[in-house]
């Protein structure tokens, strides 16, 4: 007889405070919620929320993605969020509204868009 391997069921940890990282590009919006140490709790994208093509880059798609990510975070017992927004995309503000609509308390909003201090040379100009 083969012995059954006893595996314990993984219990979900209760995380009350977290950080929401919103990466808004011109083509997509990625919402990722981490705990205070940077470990990923849940994530969602506007492309993964059922939007394809040019509709993926709309503010409404970002709001839906942030809402679904907020639902997943509530399942972990999350209540308070700090929001870090990165990028120039159209889904910046509406993603914050989507998180707020789920009942998560937003404590602070920080813009962490990387800005070069005259670093690398940009690529050549497009000629259409």
Curated annotation (Swiss-Prot):
Keywords in alphabetical order: Ribonucleoprotein, Ribosomal protein, RNA-binding, rRNA-binding
Cysteines paired by S-S bonds: none
One Gene Ontology term, aspect cellular component: ribonucleoprotein complex
Keyword Disulfide bond: no
Entry superkingdom: Bacteria
GO biological process, any: translation
InterPro entries: Ribosomal_uS11 (IPR001971), Ribosomal_uS11_bac-type (IPR019981), Ribosomal_uS11_CS (IPR018102), Ribosomal_uS11_sf (IPR036967)
GO MF assignments: rRNA binding; structural constituent of ribosome
SUPFAM superfamilies, alphabetized: Translational machinery components
Keyword Metal-binding among UniProt keywords: no
Complexes and interactors: Part of the 30S ribosomal subunit. Interacts with proteins S7 and S18. Binds to IF-3.
Free-text function comment from the UniProt entry: Located on the platform of the 30S subunit, it bridges several disparate RNA helices of the 16S rRNA. Forms part of the Shine-Dalgarno cleft in the 70S ribosome.
Family to which the UniProt record says this protein belongs: Belongs to the universal ribosomal protein uS11 family.
PANTHER family, per the entry: 40S RIBOSOMAL PROTEIN S14/30S RIBOSOMAL PROTEIN S11 (PTHR11759)
NCBIfam families: PRK05309.1, uS11_bact
Protein name (database record): Small ribosomal subunit protein uS11
Organism, as annotated: Vesicomyosocius okutanii subsp. Calyptogena okutanii (strain HA)
Gene name of this polypeptide: rpsK
